């Protein structure tokens, strides 16, 4: 399950969601400044504004602020979105895997109102029963960017959010634990700034390679 930031759509999408937040805030500004205002009345007014058709939704099609959109990209006609298809196709292409060697990946892709840094919740079935500490060690030692976050509330709240990951090449990986489905089933949650990894960083690396060959 991916939780993808507004910036995945582009600059205009980021502006749109910020504008929606602004308009929703303006709708209940008086109530927010009144400690005696009932929260249910504030919620009613926000929901009415979201449903009014007055918010700018030219980019996303529906309000994203204070909500989410459980569909990204085009409809492939088989119940799957193109973004969900890409997760399997691109992963195996990057790994160079074909046929029976392919890693089977599937899930839902959801747009959320974070500004940048995509997140994903993973359910993995391993081929053998490994201790959690060993899994954490493998992840931590694989590359310089993966940063294991201890599976505690405080560490998760501090280091495993889009706010914590944005602007950095580090990829926090946390919530690693055994699942009740069986000892080979492992959960994990990751966050990464796709504006760096998906755009700026590949270009920077290509330029370094090109400059090195001049």
Language-model features: where?
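Active-site-lining helix/loop region of Rossmann-like oxidoreductase modules
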Residues: 1-138
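C-terminal active-site/capping subdomain that shapes the small-molecule cofactor and substrate pocket
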Residues: 99-214
């Amino acid at each position: 399950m991916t939780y993808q930031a507004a910036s995945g759509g582009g600059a205009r999408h980021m502006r749109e969601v910020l504008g929606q937040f602004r308009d929703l805030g303006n709708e209940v500004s008086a109530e927010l400044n009144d400690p005696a205002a009932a929260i249910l009345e504030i919620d009613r007014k926000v929901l009415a504004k979201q449903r009014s058709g007055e918010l700018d939704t030219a980019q996303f099609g529906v309000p994203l602020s204070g909500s989410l959109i459980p569909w990204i990209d085009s409809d492939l006609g088989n119940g799957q979105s193109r973004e969900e298809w890409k997760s399997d196709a691109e992963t195996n292409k990057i790994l160079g895997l074909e046929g029976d060697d392919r890693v089977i990946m599937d899930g839902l892709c959801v747009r959320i109102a974070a500004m940048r840094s995509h997140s994903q919740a993973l359910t993995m079935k391993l081929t053998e029963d490994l201790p959690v500490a060993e899994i954490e060690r493998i992840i931590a030692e694989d590359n310089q960017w993966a940063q294991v976050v201890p599976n505690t509330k405080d560490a998760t709240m501090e280091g495993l959010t889009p706010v914590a990951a944005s602007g950095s090449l580090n990829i926090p990986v946390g919530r690693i634990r055994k699942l009740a489905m069986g000892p080979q089933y492992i959960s994990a949650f990751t966050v990464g700034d796709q504006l760096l990894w998906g755009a700026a960083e590949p270009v920077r690396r290509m330029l370094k390679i090109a400059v090195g060959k001049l």
